[in-house]
Regions:
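Active-site machinery of serine-nucleophile hydrolases
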Residues: 57-59, 70-81, 123-151, 157, ...
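Alpha/beta-hydrolase active-site loop
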Residues: 124, 156-191, 208-210
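Short substrate-entry loop that stabilizes the transition state in hydrolases
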Residues: 92-109, 114-151, 247-251
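C-terminal motif of bacterial Sec signal peptides marking the signal peptidase cleavage site
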Residues: 17-20
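A conserved short beta-strand
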Residues: 142, 214-225, 269
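Active-site-adjacent alpha-helix of alpha/beta-hydrolase-fold enzymes
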Residues: 233-326
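Gly/Ala-rich beta-loop-alpha elbow adjacent to hydrolase catalytic centers
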Residues: 198-202, 206
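Domain-level recognition of soluble alpha/beta enzyme cores
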Residues: 24-112, 289, 300-324
């Protein structure tokens, strides 16, 4: 597999642990569970009729004087629903990124695409996207309006775009942003080779886009692969991650997809997290927790939410489920480790094994790898 390196790894060695960084990192069972050597910046760019949220590395200290960025799920609602909600029903989610902070000049950094799920929005997994930026990746997440929250609630886009075509448009848009004189991310993005991860329906996007020639790895989260699908799994390195109480995408579907990927020549990996539900790889359960969660807040405010969306919007948030914050370190570590290995930042896999459990006490999980 071709290998790709960037100067940020040298920064990691200097900032984190000195000259012994590579040895210490390689020996750590869960080296990437915590934030990396960079801060995370965030900016929003336009792509036709929709927005792309972009997270990127920021040198330590360059976030001075800035407040952590927050987003509001209410901003993604159709106008008709927004008009029903009282003005004070608008819980923020505070992220680990700083808006418009100056981008580190230690790049260019590899591009990772994130695809959100059904009835969701581009910011849905900032717990992960900001983390990846701290480890030296530029992460771009577009609004897949065709399956987004506003569309599901009655305000679809016109025209509608096919998901993989839209994903390619994001790559092209990021390449232009990299070349635009004076742009915040000028010279900071490498788009020659990319990776993609996605949640639920976005995991399906990652599978379909994974066959593109410039993709080095695809990482479906809480997603499966129908046995009767007309799409063939790409013979590319893959990481499949889900929870064993997922009531939306039955875990067996993810396991079957991993087993199908295991018949190919490229490495396939599976992480199955005990007691994690469908929304574990997202911010959603953590939004408005004090009010019973975002769905309960909406119901209390009188929003007419279909029962199917109530189930989708609460799976993994129930009291018996693993608290989502306890699952995040495991998700962060394995996704980061897979990306660093696939892009060649780590010449050998770091923490892609059962041994990672030694550094991830918050959650219990099983790990498989093939071949």
């Amino acid at each position: 597999m071709p290998r790709w390196t960037f100067r940020a790894f040298a920064v990691c060695c200097l900032i984190v642990t000195g000259a012994a960084c590579s040895n210490d990192t390689a020996s750590a069972p869960a080296a990437y569970r915590d934030a990396g050597p960079f801060e995370a910046g965030v900016t929003t760019i336009m792509l036709a009729d929709r927005m792309v949220e972009v997270w990127y590395p920021v040198d330590p200290g360059d976030d001075a004087g800035l407040e952590p960025d927050a987003y509001f799920i209410r901003d993604t609602l159709p106008d008709a629903f927004d008009a029903i909600l009282p003005a004070d029903v608008n819980p923020p989610f505070v992220t680990d990124a700083y808006r418009e902070a100056p981008a580190s000049d230690e790049g260019p950094f590899p591009l990772v695409l994130f695809a959100h799920g059904f009835a969701s929005y581009r910011n849905q997994s900032t717990f992960l996207t900001t983390h990846l930026a701290s480890w030296g990746f530029v992460v771009a997440s577009v609004d897949y309006l065709e399956r987004g929250l506003a569309s599901v609630l009655g305000q679809p886009p016109d025209p509608q775009l096919e998901d993989t075509a839209l994903t390619r448009m994001v790559v092209d848009r990021m390449a232009l942003e990299n070349e635009r004189p004076g742009a915040l991310l000028e010279g900071r993005i490498s788009t020659e080779r990319v990776a993609i991860t996605g949640h639920s329906a976005g995991g399906g996007t990652s599978i379909r886009f994974g066959g593109e020639p410039d993709v080095v790895t695809y990482i479906p989260l809480s997603a499966g692969f129908p046995s009767d699908s007309m799409v063939e799994l790409a013979d590319k390195p893959s990481l499949w991650l889900t929870g064993d109480i997922d009531g939306v995408v039955e875990p067996g579907r993810t396991i079957n997809a991993f087993e199908e990927a295991s018949t190919l020549s490229a490495p396939a990996r599976l992480v199955l997290i005990d007691d994690m539900g469908h929304l574990g790889p997202s911010d959603i359960c953590a939004i408005g927790e004090s009010g019973g969660g975002i769905v309960q807040i909406a119901l209390d405010a009188g929003l007419p939410i279909p029962e199917s969306l109530v189930r989708l919007g609460t799976d993994g948030c129930q009291p018996e489920a693993l608290p989502v914050e306890d699952g995040w370190p495991t998700i962060r570590h394995f996704v980061t480790a897979q990306l660093r290995w696939a892009f060649g930042v780590d010449s050998e896999p770091v923490g892609l094994s059962e041994r990672a459990a030694e550094g991830l006490p918050e959650a219990v999980f099983s790990y498989q790898e093939s071949p």
